Amino acid sequence: MFLPSPNNLSGLNQNILEELLRDKRSPNTRRTYAKALKDFFLTMAGEEPSPDVIAWFLSLDHFQAIAMVLRYRAELLAKDLKPATINVRLAAIKSLVNYARRVGKCQYTLEDVEGLKAETYRDTTGVSPTSFKQITDHITPDSLKGKRDLAIMRLLWDNALRRAEVCGLNVGDYQPTERQLLIKGKGKLGKQAITLSAKGMALINQWLTAIGPRPKNEPLFCTLDRATFGHRLSGNAIYNLVRTSAESAGIHKVMSPHRVRHSAITAALEATNGDTRKVQKLSRHSNLNTLMIYDDNRHQHQAQITDILADLL
């Protein structure tokens, strides 16, 4: 379906899409929404999003807009995409429309367009503490890179940090006197203090001593290659660090920072005999039901029942 040339665009003198993306706090959300909206307009309009084609879409009447988004949802279903992926793309379109309504560039809503029911956080499998120690034991602390990598791996395990939380750390966020680290959690506006382990602090101290004095607004963990020395580590860099370290240690499961987080949370539940309230302080999940999924997977209740049924025959 290709849209006709847009008309009556004199009232739109700014790029609504750029405004929307600037309004999003998370860089990851900005990238995801930009990609989703690009796919929507390429699929339904035959061209990439521009001020003109976006204005045309926003000028549709209520029923035309809903019909178009429902057709797009049908296209995504036909591609056999996961419900979570489809919901993210629909959320991006709804966010665009909602933002445009707030600034007076659109008269309709997409509240009648429902997302798909998705099962979330199902795969919470990770590795055991023994396997994770095997990974860290293969990182040599003799080099500057080794000291940095060990400190990062400790934070991923001891505090179950997300990679974006590690990337966003500044030197000034480390407060050894208080035994604290200030992190910007997922979806949070401000920073929150978390308590560090003695072993974690020791590794951070070794890294900071080796790298030398740096301003408080500089990244706590930085790049070390000649071309970009001192720059903030990217999320991809931390992902590659975890994955390659696991491979070097002979771990067959594909590891990632989030899988380390899964591993740490599962190990914490095991160590506390399933005390989800206590472990929630570590994981910082806003919804306790998410931790219940971790706990269910830890016990493998379904597997146990399946074995019981099999033995009845």
Swiss-Prot record:
<keyword id="KW-0238">DNA-binding</keyword>
<feature type="active site">
    <location>
        <position position="258"/>
    </location>
</feature>
<dbReference type="Pfam" id="PF00589">
    <property type="entry name" value="Phage_integrase"/>
</dbReference>
<keyword id="KW-0159">Chromosome partition</keyword>
<dbReference type="InterPro" id="IPR002104">
    <property type="entry name" value="Integrase_catalytic"/>
</dbReference>
<feature type="active site">
    <location>
        <position position="261"/>
    </location>
</feature>
<keyword id="KW-0132">Cell division</keyword>
<feature type="active site" description="O-(3'-phospho-DNA)-tyrosine intermediate">
    <location>
        <position position="294"/>
    </location>
</feature>
<dbReference type="GO" id="GO:0009009">
    <property type="term" value="F:site-specific recombinase activity"/>
</dbReference>
<feature type="active site">
    <location>
        <position position="188"/>
    </location>
</feature>
<protein>
    <recommendedName>
        <fullName>Tyrosine recombinase slr0733</fullName>
    </recommendedName>
</protein>
<feature type="domain" description="Core-binding (CB)">
    <location>
        <begin position="7"/>
        <end position="101"/>
    </location>
</feature>
<dbReference type="InterPro" id="IPR004107">
    <property type="entry name" value="Integrase_SAM-like_N"/>
</dbReference>
<dbReference type="Pfam" id="PF02899">
    <property type="entry name" value="Phage_int_SAM_1"/>
</dbReference>
<feature type="active site">
    <location>
        <position position="285"/>
    </location>
</feature>
<dbReference type="InterPro" id="IPR011010">
    <property type="entry name" value="DNA_brk_join_enz"/>
</dbReference>
<dbReference type="GO" id="GO:0007059">
    <property type="term" value="P:chromosome segregation"/>
</dbReference>
<keyword id="KW-0229">DNA integration</keyword>
<dbReference type="InterPro" id="IPR013762">
    <property type="entry name" value="Integrase-like_cat_sf"/>
</dbReference>
<dbReference type="InterPro" id="IPR010998">
    <property type="entry name" value="Integrase_recombinase_N"/>
</dbReference>
<keyword id="KW-0131">Cell cycle</keyword>
<dbReference type="GO" id="GO:0005737">
    <property type="term" value="C:cytoplasm"/>
</dbReference>
<dbReference type="GO" id="GO:0051301">
    <property type="term" value="P:cell division"/>
</dbReference>
<dbReference type="InterPro" id="IPR050090">
    <property type="entry name" value="Tyrosine_recombinase_XerCD"/>
</dbReference>
<comment type="similarity">
    <text>Belongs to the 'phage' integrase family.</text>
</comment>
<comment type="function">
    <text>Site-specific tyrosine recombinase, which acts by catalyzing the cutting and rejoining of the recombining DNA molecules.</text>
</comment>
<dbReference type="InterPro" id="IPR044068">
    <property type="entry name" value="CB"/>
</dbReference>
<dbReference type="GO" id="GO:0006310">
    <property type="term" value="P:DNA recombination"/>
</dbReference>
<feature type="active site">
    <location>
        <position position="162"/>
    </location>
</feature>
<keyword id="KW-0963">Cytoplasm</keyword>
<feature type="domain" description="Tyr recombinase">
    <location>
        <begin position="122"/>
        <end position="307"/>
    </location>
</feature>
<dbReference type="GO" id="GO:0003677">
    <property type="term" value="F:DNA binding"/>
</dbReference>
<keyword id="KW-0233">DNA recombination</keyword>
